[in-house]
C-alpha cells in the first residue's frame, strides 16, 4: 500500500478492507455517502506534496477555492482567504499567480487554502518533500507555530523519520500497509518493538528525543 492509498483510506476515497477510522467517536467506514461528503467538505482538508494550485487563479482565488465550492458568499470567502494568507506570511501576494512564486511560497498557498475552510482535521501528504532543506525546515517550524495558534488535529505523512519526530506528538510507523508501532517519539526511540522500527531509529540523535529519565539507570541500594 502506497502513501496515497493510506490517505485515501482515511478519507474513504478507497474503502478500507478491514479496521475502523474513528472521528469524534464515529466510525466513518459505516456512515452514509452523504454524511461522508459532508465530513470531507466541512471537517477535513488536505495539503499535497506538489501543491495542487490552479495556475489560472491568483493566490487569493486559489486559497478561497474550497470556500467557493462550499457555497460561501464572495466577501466572506475573500475575508477568510485573506486571513489565511496573512497567517502563512504571504501578505501582499494576493494578486500574484502561482508561477510567480517560489516552491516554498507555493506550499504556503497550499497550506493557506487548506486552513481557509477551517477544518477540524488537516491531512498532510508529504507536503515538504519537494522543497530544499532550508525551506523545508522553515516550513516545518512555521507549521508548528500555526498548530500552536489553531490547535487543529493534523495527520502528517512522511517517509522521513526525523521529520516525523520533529512534527509529531504521536507517530505510527507502517510496514506493508500495517502499523508496526504507535507511540510518542520518545517511546518509539527508547523501545522499538522490532528490528524494522529499530532500523528507523538507528540514525536518530537520541539526545534530541530522550529525556534524562529514560536513559538513567536506577542506582541499586545495598
Language-model-detected regions and their locations in the chain:
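ABC ATPase NBD coupling module
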Residues: 28-45, 69, 75, 192
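Conserved ABC ATPase "signature" region
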Residues: 26-27, 64, 68, 75-93, ...
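A short, proline-enriched helix->beta-strand linker immediately N-terminal to the Walker B motif
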Residues: 116-120
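ABC ATPase "signature
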Residues: 182-183, 191
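Helix-to-loop junction immediately C-terminal to a conserved catalytic motif
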Residues: 11
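Conserved ABC ATPase signature
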Residues: 97-101, 105
Amino acid at each position: 500500500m502506497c502513501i496515497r492509498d493510506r490517505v485515501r483510506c482515511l478519507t474513504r476515497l478507497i474503502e478500507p478492507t478491514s479496521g475502523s477510522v474513528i472521528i469524534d467517536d464515529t466510525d466513518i467506514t459505516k456512515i452514509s455517502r452523504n454524511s461522508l461528503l459532508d465530513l470531507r467538505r466541512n471537517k477535513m482538508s488536505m495539503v499535497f506534496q506538489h501543491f495542487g494550485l490552479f495556475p489560472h487563479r491568483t493566490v487569493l482565488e486559489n486559497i478561497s477555492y474550497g470556500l467557493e465550492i462550499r457555497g460561501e458568499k464572495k466577501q466572506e470567502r475573500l475575508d477568510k482567504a485573506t486571513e489565511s494568507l496573512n497567517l502563512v506570511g504571504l501578505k501582499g501576494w494576493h494578486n500574484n499567480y502561482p508561477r510567480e512564486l517560489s516552491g516554498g511560497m507555493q506550499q504556503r498557498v497550499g497550506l493557506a487554502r487548506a486552513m481557509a475552510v477551517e477544518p477540524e482535521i488537516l491531512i498532510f501528504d508529504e507536503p515538504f518533500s519537494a522543497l530544499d532543506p532550508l525551506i523545508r525546515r522553515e516550513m516545518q517550524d512555521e507549521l508548528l507555530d500555526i498548530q500552536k495558534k489553531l490547535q487543529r488535529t493534523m495527520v502528517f505523512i512522511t517517509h522521513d523519520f526525523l521529520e516525523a519526530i520533529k512534527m509529531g506528538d504521536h507517530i505510527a510507523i507502517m510496514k506493508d500497509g500495517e502499523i508496526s508501532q504507535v507511540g510518542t517519539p520518545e517511546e518509539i526511540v527508547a523501545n522499538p518493538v522490532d528490528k524494522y522500527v529499530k532500523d528507523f531509529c538507528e540514525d536518530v540523535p537520541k539526545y534530541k528525543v530522550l529525556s534524562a529519565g529514560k536513559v538513567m539507570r536506577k542506582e541499586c541500594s545495598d
